[in-house]
Every structure is written in C-alpha cells, then in structure tokens.
Amino acid sequence: MTKTLTNKLAEKEHAAVVTYIMGGDGGLDNLEEQLLFLEKSGVSAIEIGIPFSDPVADGPIIQLAGLRALKEQVSLEAILNKLAMSKVQIPLIIMSYINPIFHLGIPKFVELVQKTPVKGLIIPDLPYEHQKLITPELQGTDIALIPLVSLTSPKERLEEIAKQAEGFIYAVTVNGTTGVRSEFDAHIDSHLAYLKSISPVPVLAGFGVSSIEHVEKFAHVCDGVIIGSKVVQMLHEEKTAELGAFLQKAAEVRIKN
C-alpha cells in the first residue's frame, strides 16, 4: 500500500515544501493556529517536533524552541491529543526522539497517532538496524516511518535503506546539527541525484535550507525540501506575514530534474 504521505509529496511539477515546527513552542493553544497558517501558505506537509531534554540532532534555534515548550509542560501525549482535534487537511509528521515514545509506550503511541492527521514518523536517534522496535506496530497503518540518510552513508547502505523506504527519504544535507546555513557540501548535488535515482519514494533535502535559492538549488536534484530553523525562528518572532510570503514563493518553485 502506497502511503498517503508518498502520494502527497510525489507531485512532479513543484518542489515539495515540508516545514518543521516545535510542538508547544508558544504554548499548545497556538498549535492549531500555526498548522492552519502553514497549510494556507501552501506547504505540502508539516513536521511537528516533540520537545525533549537531550536533542542531539537539533541546532540552537530548535533547541531553544524545545526548551520553551518544555517550560510549558508540553508532552508527546498532550500534542497528540491536540492533533486529534485538528482541522488540517495536509499530512502531518511527528519528529520525536525515541525516549518520549518509549515513555508513552509504543502501542499507545501508535493508537493515538491514528486518531490524528499524522501520516509520517521520524525518529532521529533510532538507527535503521533497530527499526523493528517500532515497525511491527506500524504494520497495516497509513503511518510511514521515514528514514534519515547522511552524506557519509556508503552506497550499499543507501540502497538498502531506499529499498525499504516509506513516505519519503529525509536526505540530511550537512554533517552536523540543524540550523540556517549559507553553504553546503560540494558533493551534495551528486549525492541527492544518486539517492533520487534509486529511491521508490520522494527524496527531500533537509538541515540548513533557509532561502528561495536553496529551494531552487535542490529542485534540480531531488523532490523538495524541509525547512525548519527559519520557520521556528520566524514564528517565534511573530513574523507571520514575511514567513507566509516566503513559503508561498518556495512552494511555487518548479522541479527541474
């Protein structure tokens, strides 16, 4: 069964734009408003980060957002309960470290997720080899377990991951944490083009994407982008008009590969 998320991101004319927000940054009561605003801005899907005290993959902007959410006593369960009432029509993606999921309990987590518009799951600290901790519970659901692949992964590993991939492949564009960047690795284009050539699902570039130029660059070699730190910062600074205009422009970028 092809997952809903794959179908949504596989549109070939325009680059898929997925935005990341930290769930509960600014309080849980703002979550639905943020989601509806991003949907109206033309994004393809929205990643919702779950605040965690030891976020190893997060850069400073997202770490601070997580701390703000933790101060509001935001939890994974509270976010899922809020999402169960969401009116959002585009797919949502939960991005959580494994610890909050274990704490809630994997069966309960999957049960709660299925009551929401969430169609994808990213667990940055769950290695590919240990996916079986959660895949049995996801079987038969419309929830895609999305793999992250790094710049340094050997080709055999990329091929193995691509073969099993669901939803989309999250291609990490830098060696390091998330955050706004001006430059990318010299080999990033060939890496993404190779991934796209072997992947049965869309390939999206993430970590450091923060300008229209970045979106246009990656539209030459993959299917779209994930924009995180820039979105988190602009929402925090309440620059919604500026952010909305940026995202609408990003969503109009045409795929050129």
Curated annotation (Swiss-Prot):
InterPro entries linked: Aldolase_TIM (IPR013785), RibuloseP-bd_barrel (IPR011060), Trp_synthase_alpha_AS (IPR018204), Trp_synthase_suA (IPR002028)
Catalyzed reactions: (1S,2R)-1-C-(indol-3-yl)glycerol 3-phosphate + L-serine = D-glyceraldehyde 3-phosphate + L-tryptophan + H2O
Keyword Lyase: yes
Membrane spanning stretches: none
Lyase found in the keyword field: yes
GO biological process per UniProt: L-tryptophan biosynthetic process
EC number of the protein: 4.2.1.20
Record CDD domains: Tryptophan_synthase_alpha (cd04724)
Pfam families noted in UniProt: Trp_syntA (PF00290)
Pathway(s) this gene product operates in, as recorded in its UniProt entry: Amino-acid biosynthesis; L-tryptophan biosynthesis; L-tryptophan from chorismate: step 5/5
Superkingdom to which the source organism belongs: Bacteria
PROSITE patterns, A to Z: TRP_SYNTHASE_ALPHA
Family the entry assigns: Belongs to the TrpA family.
Purpose: The alpha subunit is responsible for the aldol cleavage of indoleglycerol phosphate to indole and glyceraldehyde 3-phosphate.
Entries under HAMAP family matching the protein: Trp_synth_alpha
Summary of subunit composition and partner proteins: Tetramer of two alpha and two beta chains.
Name by which UniProt lists this protein: Tryptophan synthase alpha chain
Organism of origin: Listeria monocytogenes serovar 1/2a (strain ATCC BAA-679 / EGD-e)
